[in-house]
């Protein structure tokens, strides 16, 4: 097995990617292809499931062949994916009955409101760890059954299959033989009991979704089956599955209770490992399964921030004060602080821990002396402040004081932002050498299942530090800044409340 590699497939919201990793956890090859975003109506977001499959299969082959290798060089495949996105297909033909309804899609928001009005939120949260929201898969499945002609009849006859993106890829890689998912993806459907780790019959009945549609739920690291497609001539074990944020938590080696990672992308996704027991959040966080390896199940708390890197894109495309996103660090660093300016980037409402859909983006503290540099710095600071709000909620829910924050994602390359994040938290922000932690996590899960890596300790030893950012700002200064931020958030919420 000396010359073999692990292939990680990273099926994201805007592109399908594939990466080859060697035994040291280094990236050997990478391929990526974007695909179409479909917006049939305002608030609706869809993907073509066949395009998800064709782009993912295409980059898988490309990542392997561009290094002069073939399928025999692949020891196993690990899959990580955009979560919650919902695909329903015909078991006989393998054809989708409707486009994939993407996690961002809000078409079922009114139906979710009606469930809340029936007083069901506490029950759903107790079973699934999730609030009732159109973000999750359950109401998307129901929408397809209610709105695609003949779908409900076919579903009752056992002729339809539902899957999140991982299930759809495995179904196609095995030529319609395997209909499986893992516990992490199942835990994002709003149909899965995270305590019993089974599909919940009461929730299925409530939403009128036949049990026969659902995939078998497996661990995140086991051999599910082997590839049977023409993508690879040889049969390759499919051996790891995890939703993208769960895979990133594993790739960051946040393997013990209290360890936290923050992925800085378009939004921010913070996840804390809470060990072998789920913690019900009292602070508007989501409780979820982190992963399962063998009989060992780890749980996590998660908080999502809607706008992080997107605020930098707005400064570039909407306001025009920078030409490229990379310019923001130098512009922001040209002033020592924001001079009292606060930017609350609630362009799409506020996510965790506020969950205020009506709040809107606001800038406070502007004076005649305010410059584009102050705005740029306020934008970066806002990413760190929002992350702090979620981390404070995590500490309150878990009773665990955070020792350090492991960071990844595009904006983690911004040293100014990382330093300010450490200053606010009062603990180190730690950046690894390999920031492709989502794909790496999927690779590790697959490799562990087949013995490519012996155990968790061997994998842990591969995590390498790029840079550690230690807090250096005086405590009273931090408290003053945080008080200003909290005031700005209160003002943004008040603005929203006054529009009633």
From Swiss-Prot:
Question: What span is annotated as the signal peptide, if there is one?
Answer: none
Query: Which pathway, per its entry?
Result: Polyol metabolism; glycerol degradation via glycerol kinase pathway; sn-glycerol 3-phosphate from glycerol: step 1/1
What InterPro entries is this protein classified in?
A: ATPase_NBD, Carb_kinase_FGGY, Carb_kinase_FGGY_CS, FGGY_C, FGGY_N, Glycerol_kin
Which amino acids does the record list as binding ATP?
A: 13-15, 266, 309, 313, 410
- What UniProt keywords apply to this chain's record, in alphabetical order? ATP-binding, Glycerol metabolism, Kinase, Nucleotide-binding, Transferase
Residues that, per the record, bind glycerol: 83-84, 135, 244-245
**Which reaction does this enzyme catalyse, per its entry?**
glycerol + ATP = sn-glycerol 3-phosphate + ADP + H(+)
Query: Per its UniProt record, what Pfam families does this chain match?
Result: FGGY_C, FGGY_N
Q: Where does sn-glycerol 3-phosphate bind?
A: 13, 83-84, 135, 244
| Stretches assigned to coiled coil | none
| CDD domains (alphabetical) | FGGY_EcGK_like
E.C. number: 2.7.1.30
Cellular component terms per the entry's GO annotation: cytosol
Q: Which GO terms describe its molecular function?
A: ATP binding; glycerol kinase activity
Question: Which residues are listed for ADP binding in this entry?
Answer: 13, 17, 266, 309, 410, 414
Activity-regulation annotation:
Inhibited by fructose 1,6-bisphosphate (FBP).
A single GO BP term for this record reads: glycerol-3-phosphate metabolic process
Q: Which PROSITE patterns match?
A: FGGY_KINASES_1, FGGY_KINASES_2
What is the annotated role of this protein in its UniProt record?
Answer: Key enzyme in the regulation of glycerol uptake and metabolism. Catalyzes the phosphorylation of glycerol to yield sn-glycerol 3-phosphate.
The family assignment reads:
Belongs to the FGGY kinase family.
> Would you tell me the protein name for this molecule?
Glycerol kinase
What taxonomic ancestry is recorded?
Answer: Bacteria, Pseudomonadati, Pseudomonadota, Betaproteobacteria, Burkholderiales
What gene is behind this protein?
Answer: glpK
